[in-house]
Amino acid sequence: MSDSENEYDETDQLVKEEDEKMSDQRLTSEGADTSAEPKKKYDPKDPLRPRRKKARRACFACQRAHLTCGDERPCQRCIKRNLMESCQDGVRKKAKYLHDAPPEALRPVLGPNYNPNPTPRQNGHRHPSIQTSEASSNQGTFFSQSPATQFPLFSAAQTPIGNLAETLPFANQQSPTSPSFQTSGNPQISGMTVPQVSSPMTNFGTLPFDPSDPNIYNFNLEGLNFGSQYGAMEFGMLGHMSSGAAETPPGDATMARSASGSLGFGPGVFGNGVNQFDNVYEGNILDGFLGLDANHNGLYSQGNLQHGLPHAYAIAAGPTSIQSPSTDTNSPQPTPLGFEGSPTMATFSTTPGSKPANQQRPSTRQSNAIAKLGQQSVLGKRQRDPSFVYDTVKEPFGYVSSFHKLFILIQKRFTAAHTSRIAKSLASIRPSLMASTKNLTKQDLVFMEKYFQRSLLEYEEFMHQCSSPTLACRRTGEVAIVNKEFCALTGWTKDVLLGKEPNLNVNLGGSASANTNSKARVGLATPRLKSLNTESGGSTDGPRPVYLAELLDHESVVEFYEDYSQLAFNDSRGHKTRKCRLLKYRAPDKDDGTGESSTDGQLPQKDPRNSILSNRVAKIDGEHGISKLERDGKLECSYTWTIKRDVFDMPMLFVINVST
């Protein structure tokens, strides 16, 4: 073992001596003046010393001699030593996590499709406008790229079309749902010419740089002046990517406008002597639709799905249906594209003398179509624009009246022992709330409400993506936002929780022994609370949202407010996790209006023809799985909640995540 190591050491020593002699000979041969001063030696700790260019790969000879190699093959050192034939990439030492990887996967520089001399692709239908020369890479040049071939969209001369009906890709196909119309050959079509749409432009099929070209990694690290080579290489790669973005051709909307303005269909195109396509739509209506934002108001933006349904294609009516799956066909709401008076396909028959039903359209039809699209651009029922919050909130929220309603609710629904424990918890945070709001003016309270509504926009977007049942409440306990998972779990609808519909729940969660002597009072709880919705003033006008105390049983509500007194002002980053019992929503019977609970506990059925789901889905059935969890109208769950504070360091809202 020692003999072999000595042999390798002697060989390496000879190779190093030979390299030093070759470098000395090169210096003496290249230098014109042999009496020049000797080569200056730099301090290895000098930050301004010239550094070697780091190579990303090395051949076997350079790797064995621990010398800097180049990216070309054969390298310069192997050429000087007459080792051109054996100059191949050396095998680098694998990391432990790459032992199972094949050697071909460990070559990030030269890909399998790299061609140092790219040739332009010849297309039979398009002619290249610029002939590219053979690309040559220079070792001392940085950011070298191979020039990309440019192809014009059309030739400069107008190209005559032989037959328009034959060149169209869908000439012989027919839609199963569209009415058929007659077509006849016309010799005038063969003479129609297509003008030049745009100037020659860069081919979109090629990247601005070749990722397999090793020259793209040839960065001038010293010139970039980075403290780390990794940051310099990342900055250089971003420079490569942005260099091609500066030569981006005009946008699609501009191209579409120019194309629609250049292509004209005169009366002689269809040979029937009638100019059908000139006055059907105005000339600028197509430009108006093509200039809309593709993400919001585009022609394919599913603007008709504004009724809370999932954005998915509806299934066809049956296996024998020839109707394609589409949201426009099956949606109960019409698509707001503004073509109420547009002619149908049957109008454009090629028989002589036939005229479209609408030769002229009023000038206001274009503005109405764009206005309707602008109204449908809002995502969901709640506007996502923050300026909407700042413009609509003019008055502060009435927290005082909301707390009074909470106290009345607690006194009517809970026993004296439970009411005493809840009042004790709320009394512990009452001085802190009064001290925090003592110096706040009306403008501060309005700003507090704007901050609350602005935060709801962020939480609402997050709760739509959250798969667990979640709801957020004000510091008074009123439900502010809730997701559909919570509604499916408890049976409470979103409109009832937010106060848009009256609360008709008769499942109060009390035990039979606790409510035997106060059955009349419990039965009158719902009508009295309903009257409180009209006895509100200021900014709290309108229906009353449901309190959190109405969603939990008695013991769970007491435990919640005991935790609330600890997290309100003491622990700003804390959270609590407890077990609870959620109350299922139970509507009263139609025959009995005294407030007795129904036996089945299901919501009253609505007419499916009047619902937003139409005849596709009449009701989401979640009772089969939830009925296994509930017992006496209660769901055994666990919840985790935390408190979010506002800019005045006051409890703003608490977010609750429920898990069964």
UniProtKB/Swiss-Prot annotation:
InterPro entries: ERT1_acuK_gluconeogen_tf, PAS_13, Zn2-C6_fun-type_DNA-bd_sf, Zn2Cys6_DnaBD
Composition bias type Polar residues, residue spans: 129-144, 320-332, 344-368
Alphabetically ordered keywords of this record: Activator, DNA-binding, Gluconeogenesis, Metal-binding, Nucleus, Transcription, Transcription regulation, Zinc
Signal peptide (residue range): none
Cellular compartments annotated: Nucleus
A GO-annotated cellular component: nucleus
Family matches, as SMART domains: GAL4
GO molecular function: DNA-binding transcription factor activity, RNA polymerase II-specific; RNA polymerase II transcription regulatory region sequence-specific DNA binding; zinc ion binding
Chief localisation class: nucleus
Region of interest: Disordered: 1-52, 98-144, 170-191, 319-368, 587-613
Biased composition (Low complexity): 173-184
Residue ranges with Acidic residues bias: 1-12
Stretches assigned to the PAS domain: 455-526
Compositionally biased residues, Basic and acidic residues: 13-24, 36-49
GO biological process: cellular response to starvation; gluconeogenesis
Pfam families on file: PAS_13 (PF24990)
Annotated DNA-binding residue span(s): 59-87
Family, per entry: Belongs to the ERT1/acuK family.
Its job: Transcription factor which regulates nonfermentable carbon utilization. Activator of gluconeogenetic genes.
PANTHER family in the record: TRANSCRIPTION ACTIVATOR OF GLUCONEOGENESIS ERT1, ZN(II)2CYS6 TRANSCRIPTION FACTOR (EUROFUNG)-RELATED
Protein name (database record): Transcription activator of gluconeogenesis CHGG_09150
Species annotation: Chaetomium globosum (strain ATCC 6205 / CBS 148.51 / DSM 1962 / NBRC 6347 / NRRL 1970) (Soil fungus)
Lineage: Eukaryota, Fungi, Dikarya, Ascomycota, Pezizomycotina
